[in-house]
Amino acid sequence: MEFVVSLFAFVVSCFILLKVAKNSKNPKRNTNLELPPGPKQLPIIGNLHQLGGGLAHHVLRNLGKQYGPLMHLKIGELSTIVVSSTEIAKEVFKTHDIHFSNRPSHILVFKIVSYDYKDIVLSQYGKYWRELRKVCNLELLSPNRVQSFRSIREDAVLNMMKSISSNDGKVVNLSEMILSLIYGITARAAFGVWSKKHEEFIRLESEIQRLATTFVLADMFPSIKFLGALSGLRYKVEKVHKKVDDILEGILKEHRRQNNNMTEENGKKDLVDVLLNIQKNGDMETPFTDQHIKAIIFDMFSAGTLTSTIAVDWAMAEMMKNPSVLKRAQDEVRNVYNGIGNVDESKLDELKYLQAVIKETLRIHPGTPIVHRETREECEINGYRIPAKARVMVNAWAISRDPNYWPEPDIFKPERFLGSEVDFKGTHFEYIPFGAGRRICPGISYAIANVQLPLAQLLYHFEWKLPGGMKPEELDMTEILGTAAQRKENLLLIPNSHSCSSLKQV
């Protein structure tokens, strides 16, 4: 906190004249409508000092209770709108969706790693994004494409089960194993193979994730261009990203070489192959260079792995904390796959209670607790003026714990989803773990596929205990926020093979 305060003091002392001069040149806006209510602002830093008292989604929920579900903050020089209710979320994601269809720009780390916003997640709304969204829906992340990776998932999950089985009765770090599993599945889906080179890529991607959690003053004051270089962060990110780029460049060259000797019949397509074919065939009307391809592949790892990893980890932790939920989920999986000895994807649709466990996990622990947008133009919501180019933070975490929609919202209760029509596809605005509207996450099917099978296998093959005689209520569920909301501590558990498991014979 002292570091942040000192930086604020630096900003106040060095740039106050610049800010005054800049603001004096701004044209007057339409003042017929007021901005949404919000706390008082300090000169220069605005409300930035009020966001340092805990996790952002917790702090914003508490502020929303004071100032309402539609709130205005000034974060540095950024006009910021905070949404904390189902009703306002519907206004943002449905009624005024086109006005809120941009992603925040001028974010130092993301600008570098996305090759200047050439990816899916961060590209600005327009023709390129619409074409890219179509490619995602029809090619990259279509149900057929996700299904084509079934054998990759089944092989990878089975190998993890064997590894756990070899440590029967011993403490295993399940969090690390899940992370390695999801990264491995994504690497094989994207690149076709798994190698030491890809392990280095994943290590570098994790380092970028760490750097992305750094407090960046330049992001709060984008008009002051040299702040990014001042902290040294730009140099660190560019150095790591150069190594990432070298690896991706090598992967593209290798795929091009292999594709010259490959016919449709003698090899399956991975995601790099799909993107190279789109480029080669000129399927995009907008420019589609190697940088665009590399940005999209990086998206798959940065966005595609964390959501699934965190969901599996939280689900197992919640079941360990709630033994009755664990037993019911295990009984269901073992009944559906009775006599088979292993779990594949053929009957996952029959696991209704496990699906409810996953939905409840995403409700109480959304991987992305705050959904970020940026307004394309000024609009009006509930009689308030929403400025153009404003940052928008939709607090999905607070919305999914609203007692007006969720009885006993802080209790983990999968039964609430049994027989319920509420799902995570963006049409129920009280439940938006993947966002909603036209910028909803395009990889929902891919993410859920990587959650269901690992959980089903873990429940089927093993009985689970907490180490050291720990009681369920003693399990640490402390949350930390990096680029996603995850558990602070790794999940350490003791597996014991169940009699129904055939792992010893596999």
Swiss-Prot record:
Its cofactor is heme. InterPro entries: Cyt_P450, Cyt_P450_CS, Cyt_P450_E_grp-I, Cyt_P450_sf. It holds the Pfam family p450. It is found in: Endoplasmic reticulum membrane. The keyword rRNA processing does not apply. Keywords: Alkaloid metabolism, Endoplasmic reticulum, Glycoprotein, Heme, Iron, Membrane, Metal-binding, Monooxygenase, Oxidoreductase, Transmembrane, Transmembrane helix. The keyword Transmembrane applies. Mainly expressed in roots. Belongs to the cytochrome P450 family. This is Tabersonine 6,7-epoxidase isoform 1. It comes from Catharanthus roseus (Madagascar periwinkle).
